[in-house]
């Protein structure tokens, strides 16, 4: 991906990001805090019913660092070959959504989905009809079969409504929405050496070694007036898929400000 990246119990796209940078965001998993004084119940950060959001999206959400709640589906229905290499679904061949509470009963959602060309218009139509905005449509790789696109989306408001819209849109693809949680095969690479070179600890995502490195600047979503948690498009992604013999296919994307693009 050439722009900001929305990319996680089993590791999800968000869980892989928190492991090496736990100190950058405070983990919170509150649902409802009750204050008994005077018989008044005060809802805290968890006044969004995340279980209801999971039911609407068709998959339990994982609670991550910074009060981010995520869901992921792998494109296990596709056999993708890029530059002669069979791509693992762990190389961002997926659909994902990250939610973050912004106000009582409200949330911001950022995500993306890998699509075949024939799926793009019908998914876009379903998202727009449900009030979810498309923020980017571009390619992550250039020599793949079948030809693929990556669609990024954004929404704010009632998270249950947003989740229903996402489920409706993803149902227009070939993604098996009822897929079980993926089992992570071991990464057949010298992960310790790569950790030293990258300067962070990678995480096994479906047999792919992934690094999510938060940007140093605070990234503000000016429409909802919040600083984005680094799990929501505020990190650089590097992926290493083992090929055997100590070799790897490498892919990823950089989150950058405009003045950083040419130097990088």
Which residues make up each language-model segment?
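Long, contiguous binding/interaction regions
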Residues: 3-4, 43-147, 154-263
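Secretory targeting and sorting signals
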Residues: 2-43
């Amino acid at each position: 991906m050439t722009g900001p990246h929305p990319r996680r119990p089993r590791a999800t796209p968000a869980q892989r990001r928190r492991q090496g940078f736990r100190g950058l965001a405070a983990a919170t998993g509150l649902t409802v805090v009750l204050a008994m004084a005077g018989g008044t119940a005060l809802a805290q950060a968890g006044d969004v019913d995340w279980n209801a959001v999971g039911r609407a999206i068709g998959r339990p959400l994982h609670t991550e660092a910074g009060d981010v709640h995520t869901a992921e589906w792998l494109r296990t229905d596709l056999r993708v070959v890029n530059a002669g290499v069979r791509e693992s679904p762990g190389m961002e061949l997926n659909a994902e959504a990250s939610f973050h509470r912004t106000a009582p009963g409200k949330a911001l959602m950022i995500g993306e989905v890998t699509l075949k060309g024939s799926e793009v218009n019908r998914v876009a139509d379903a998202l727009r009809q449900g009030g979810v905005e498309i923020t980017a449509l571009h390619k992550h790789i250039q020599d793949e079969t079948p030809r693929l696109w990556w669609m990024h989306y954004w929404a704010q408001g009632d998270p249950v409504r947003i989740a229903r819209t996402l489920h409706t849109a993803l149902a227009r693809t070939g993604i098996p929405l009822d897929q079980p949680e993926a089992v992570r095969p071991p990464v057949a690479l010298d992960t310790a050496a790569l950790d030293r070179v990258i300067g962070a600890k990678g995480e096994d995502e479906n047999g792919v070694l992934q690094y999510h490195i938060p940007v140093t600047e605070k990234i503000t979503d000016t429409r909802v007036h919040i600083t984005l948690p680094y799990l929501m498009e505020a990190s650089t992604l590097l992926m290493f898929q083992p090929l055997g013999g100590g070799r790897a296919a490498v892919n990823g994307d950089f989150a950058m400000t405009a003045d950083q693009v040419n130097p990088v």
